[in-house]
């Protein structure tokens, strides 16, 4: 099974993907359309799709499963690219985790987060992601926003202190993943800017450990430009991870194949990452659709990877001097035409 690589690229050239990408086909309006493939059996499917770096939640690979997961990863020559605690699946987190109004739930969330740090290190991942999941509100004044912000500061500071104390220079870094809505009507840390502000308020000793995991679809759901979101993270030195997919306008989170909806913007994103010499993992957060049968469940990864390889190669051929020239003369329509020529 050959690994798909993005080359030439600084740093990590393999592609990442989550075990949840190969799910059972549920959505809010319908049950499963495929059998639930056991998590460790999904790893070989990811390997067959050319993936190098695996991603998983703690509810998918718990601490008790870490030894078995490491054996499977080793057998297929894979690595753990990212690990993340689920602060949304368990009903106890129905009103949030770190921002819950229930102190017992906040205590449980912190315990789970610290256990996830241990699992991240044990699995050999360098990055642990926090997705804002159910951190938010559906009714006005259901939570005090200022209290919620302070609770997040307290929680993330505790995670940072734990990682520094127990793992020192071997501590993973933490990437906060913004999303504006879904499953909550209004979510805290809804944009890259909010995440960067929160990081600036963490204890100074913890700030270097925290960055951002921007996702294409989440930026588009917020009506924002994901290229600028990524550039902002790069400018702040906080692009710790990235999730690639596609999103058809400001609708529900679709997790469509990368390169499908806005290929010119995806081409431009590759240009930005190349020029920044970014060394992290290019990872997919996509979802096999309900209509795909089990035999085709990895098609979304094959399609995303093929699109990424093509776009990356085309981006390498974009003449940066021409782009600079169009900028200097403010010939933006001509620039758009040039990029279309590079793409098509």
Regions from the language model: what does each represent?
Residues 1-50, 74, 140-141, 154-164, ...:
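Histidine-acidic metal/acid-base catalytic patches
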Residues 12-20, 61, 66-87, 119-124:
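Glycine-rich, aromatic-flanked loop segments that form ligand/cofactor-binding clefts
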Residues 53-73, 132, 138:
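Glycine-rich, proline-tolerant flexible connector loops at the mouths of alpha/beta enzymes
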